[in-house]
Amino acid sequence: MMVSFFDQFASPSYLGIPLIAIAIALPWVLYPTSSSRWINNRLITIQGWFINRFTNQLMLPLNVGGHKWALLLASLMIFLITINMLGLLPYTFTPTTQLSLNMGFAVPLWLATVIIGMRNQPTVALGHLLPEGTPIPLIPVLIIIETISLFIRPLALGVRLTANLTAGHLLIQLIATAVFVLMPMMPTVAILTATVLFLLTLLEVAVAMIQAYVFVLLLSLYLQENV
């Protein structure tokens, strides 16, 4: 029986019940919660420090009206990082390799930023569709181009996250398969390939965190235009 490399991206099911809901809910169980003690343990302290640093960095370019998004964006960042990191473990399923899930995150949040801009400052929001100093003959063309680029934003968010994680998982599986095939025939080459696999895994750990950060950072930039 031939197994496709893309089988790892198929949503698992048990007795016909999709298990993607469990894969999405599992990270929330792993987060440590603060206790009533005066001094927290090291893990909670590091988690609190990371959240504070990230929130301050993310909210720095936003005005006071955008600070109410801090909790949502910080929670989304930690959630995406956890899902991406858990997906690097063997025999696990990564929900963020599904374009439908990523679009489910990207479209509502992008749409919320657009609605906020149209409600609070419609003139400024519509002004983004026409760059200042545009020649009069180019005005209709530029409005169409800017409108298309506006609606492409959520698609770019979802596709970027999906494509980067999918490509990384495929490369890891391809090189791991090569290691097992080369081990009995050419052990030296297999060891070198295993070293490449280890370095690629470290790179994928970085990509898993960076892509989650980029996803949330772009949302904050879209929010900055509309608050």
Swiss-Prot record:
Catalytic reaction annotation: H(+)(in) = H(+)(out)
Major localization listed first in the record, in broad terms: mitochondrion
Membrane keyword on record: yes
MF annotations from Gene Ontology: proton channel activity; proton-transporting ATP synthase activity, rotational mechanism
InterPro entries to which the protein is assigned, alphabetical: ATP_synth_F0_asu, ATP_synth_F0_asu_AS, ATP_synth_F0_asu_bact/mt, F0_ATP_A_sf
GO terms for cellular component: mitochondrial inner membrane; proton-transporting ATP synthase complex
UniProt keyword annotations, A-Z: ATP synthesis, CF(0), Hydrogen ion transport, Ion transport, Membrane, Mitochondrion, Mitochondrion inner membrane, Transmembrane, Transmembrane helix, Transport
Alphabetical list of CDD domains matching this protein: ATP-synt_Fo_a_6 (cd00310)
Chain ranges passing through the membrane: 9-29, 69-89, 98-118, 132-152, 165-185, 190-210
One Pfam family from the record: ATP-synt_A
GO terms, biological process: proton motive force-driven ATP synthesis; proton transmembrane transport
SUPFAM superfamilies (UniProt xref): F1F0 ATP synthase subunit A
Locations listed in the record: Mitochondrion inner membrane
Entry membrane topology: Multi-pass membrane protein
Subunit structure: Component of the ATP synthase complex composed at least of ATP5F1A/subunit alpha, ATP5F1B/subunit beta, ATP5MC1/subunit c (homooctomer), MT-ATP6/subunit a, MT-ATP8/subunit 8, ATP5ME/subunit e, ATP5MF/subunit f, ATP5MG/subunit g, ATP5MK/subunit k, ATP5MJ/subunit j, ATP5F1C/subunit gamma, ATP5F1D/subunit delta, ATP5F1E/subunit epsilon, ATP5PF/subunit F6, ATP5PB/subunit b, ATP5PD/subunit d, ATP5PO/subunit OSCP.
Role summary: Subunit a, of the mitochondrial membrane ATP synthase complex (F(1)F(0) ATP synthase or Complex V) that produces ATP from ADP in the presence of a proton gradient across the membrane which is generated by electron transport complexes of the respiratory chain. ATP synthase complex consist of a soluble F(1) head domain - the catalytic core - and a membrane F(1) domain - the membrane proton channel. These two domains are linked by a central stalk rotating inside the F(1) region and a stationary peripheral stalk.
Family: Belongs to the ATPase A chain family.
Entry protein name: ATP synthase F(0) complex subunit a
Organism: Carassius auratus (Goldfish)
